[in-house]
Amino acid sequence: MKTKAAVAWKAGQPLTIETVDLQGPKFGEVLVEIKATGICHTDYYTLSGADPEGIFPAILGHEGAGIVVDVGPGVTTLKKGDHVIPLYTPECRQCKFCLSRKTNLCQLIRGTQGKGLMPDATSRFSLDGQPIFHYMGTSTFSNYTVAPEISLAKIREDAPFDKVCYIGCGVTTGIGAVLFTAKVEVGANVVVFGLGGIGLNVIQGAKMVGADKIIGVDLNPEREAMARKFGMTHFINPKTTENVVDAIVQLTDGGADYSFECIGNTQVMRQALECTHKGWGRSIIIGVAEAGAEISTRPFQLVTGRKWEGSAFGGARGRTDVPKIVDWYMDGKINIDDLITHTMPLEDINKGFELMKSGESIRGVVLY
């Protein structure tokens, strides 16, 4: 079949809108009509050329929502008409990682997904006979896409695509880091470094679980108002604060119980660890640093009880947890509407990237 898609031909170049060929689903695969997709910093990270796994030409996009159009042989959990959110972190429920219950990092198809291919090591996308690579197993910058069954979360049918697509990455990454990775408890003091889309979702996750002080740290004073709307209680601007770590330690009577780094800056990661409380402070790294970057601190910081941890996709098990998060949105427990600041047709997707890079948008969403 033919489908309209935004194709990334080379790193550092704008996407071009093409009509590409899409093969139907093979064994264990599902054809999905994407109805809406967010434009995420991770897409830009790959497009910029900084992603060591970036491969071109490719159809990017990993934050979508849509409807099942067809299923391949062997598919048992989905049928035509089901509403779904594609998952860049699948959940097979049978690999060593899934069965351990210690992680959400399913590895069943990781080897091929990282190469831009489907599980059988081929691509479903092509143009004039030239294969086009998949991206993160989802490729939501195409009106139609094929994904493995284990990479699709079935969701309720009354959920609006233009809002819940954001649960495919940003919302889950932020809220999940609080609920599933850190398991923040009532009354805890939390600090969030970086008040973009991920940081705001960390803040609303902290508010959701009943955290006490929720401190936001950002260089942009214009982000304070929105962060307070989502539950932030204190704001620190490093430009006007002599020592951010000392300020947080004083504000929290010895340090934060939990910190979350949502930027991908290794110097900030160090601050995020060292501002946590001696004996039990936990710092969760969410931001993705540039390839080859390393983090450092004095070992004494760890010996005295602080812990550095990472969180991918918020620690969420996609097929299990994403439907719950959709329910939270539909029940009014979390706010997504205020985070989606711009919508556009696929033809304007490059403008969406510019809005994100300039900081004008929290999340731009492409509507098909």
Q: Which residue stretches match the model-derived regions?
A:
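Adenosine-nucleotide cofactor-binding segment
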Residues: 192-195, 207-271
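Rossmann-fold dehydrogenase core element
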Residues: 281-284, 296-338
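Helix-to-beta-strand junctions that scaffold the AdoMet/dcAdoMet cofactor pocket
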Residues: 276-278
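Glycine-rich Rossmann-fold phosphate-binding loop(s) that bind the pyrophosphate
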Residues: 195-196, 288
